[in-house]
């Protein structure tokens, strides 16, 4: 009787068991592949983040290199001008050289998108100008700039230095 029970309880070989085992094996291999792909992508992303941080840091550190290189040319011209012994005979030539160097500097700033904002005679704008004082005058409409101590400048669209100005007011 025990043999009968054993033969009844033991499962005969089932073709589905082999298919299930095969399917499990495939799924385990696929899961392992997904895990490896995930780990690879995670490592790639970490490298990307590290490189992006390094690149941004270098951009912050060396971003002004082109401007500085251009400014050094102007500095060289000023150094040459300062090495000249100025006399009455060469004063006009010296002044012309300094004027040319100043123009070169202004041109360089424009090439780097630093633009002077016209101020004299313009209406006072607190987002662009800093009023140092006011002056009673008939020469200029009230609220307009009568004198400029420091010119305002912008870099692209941003004011990087407000102008220091005197604003006209109506005489009393």
Swiss-Prot record:
Q: What InterPro entries does UniProt report for this protein, alphabetically? A: GrpE, GrpE_coiled_coil, GrpE_head
Q: Which GO terms describe its biological process?
A: protein folding
Q: Which PROSITE patterns match?
A: GRPE
UniProt feature, compositional bias: Low complexity:
1-11
Location within or outside the cell? Cytoplasm
Cite the Pfam families for this sequence. Answer: GrpE
Report which superkingdom the organism of origin falls in.
Bacteria
Q: Name one GO cellular component term.
A: cytoplasm
Keywords assigned by UniProt?
Chaperone, Cytoplasm, Stress response
Instruction: From the UniProt entry, list the residue stretches annotated as the region Disordered.
Output: 1-22
| Gene Ontology terms for molecular function | adenyl-nucleotide exchange factor activity; protein homodimerization activity; protein-folding chaperone binding; unfolded protein binding
**Cross-referenced PANTHER family:** GRPE PROTEIN, GRPE PROTEIN HOMOLOG, MITOCHONDRIAL
State the function annotated in the UniProt record.
Participates actively in the response to hyperosmotic and heat shock by preventing the aggregation of stress-denatured proteins, in association with DnaK and GrpE. It is the nucleotide exchange factor for DnaK and may function as a thermosensor. Unfolded proteins bind initially to DnaJ; upon interaction with the DnaJ-bound protein, DnaK hydrolyzes its bound ATP, resulting in the formation of a stable complex. GrpE releases ADP from DnaK; ATP binding to DnaK triggers the release of the substrate protein, thus completing the reaction cycle.
Family under the similarity heading: Belongs to the GrpE family.
Quaternary organization: Homodimer.
Please identify the protein, giving its name as recorded: Protein GrpE
Origin organism is Bdellovibrio bacteriovorus (strain ATCC 15356 / DSM 50701 / NCIMB 9529 / HD100)
Q: What is the lineage of its organism?
A: Bacteria, Pseudomonadati, Bdellovibrionota, Bdellovibrionia, Bdellovibrionales
The primary gene name is grpE
């Amino acid at each position: 009787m025990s043999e009968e029970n054993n033969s009844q309880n033991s499962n005969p070989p089932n073709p589905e068991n082999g298919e299930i085992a095969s399917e499990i094996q495939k799924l385990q291999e696929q899961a392992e592949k997904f895990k490896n792909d995930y780990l690879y992508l995670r490592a790639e992303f970490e490298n990307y983040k590290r490189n992006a941080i390094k690149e941004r840091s270098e951009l912050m550190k060396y971003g002004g290199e082109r401007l500085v290189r251009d400014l050094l040319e102007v500095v060289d011209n000023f150094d040459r001008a300062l090495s000249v012994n100025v006399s009455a005979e060469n004063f006009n030539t010296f002044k012309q050289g300094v004027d040319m160097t100043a123009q070169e500097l202004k041109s360089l700033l424009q090439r780097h998108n630093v633009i002077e904002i016209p101020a004299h005679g313009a209406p006072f704008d607190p987002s662009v100008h800093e009023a140092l004082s006011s002056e009673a005058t008939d020469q200029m409409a009230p609220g307009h700039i009568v004198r400029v101590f420091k010119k305002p400048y912008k870099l692209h669209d941003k004011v990087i230095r407000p102008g220091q100005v005197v604003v006209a007011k109506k005489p009393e």
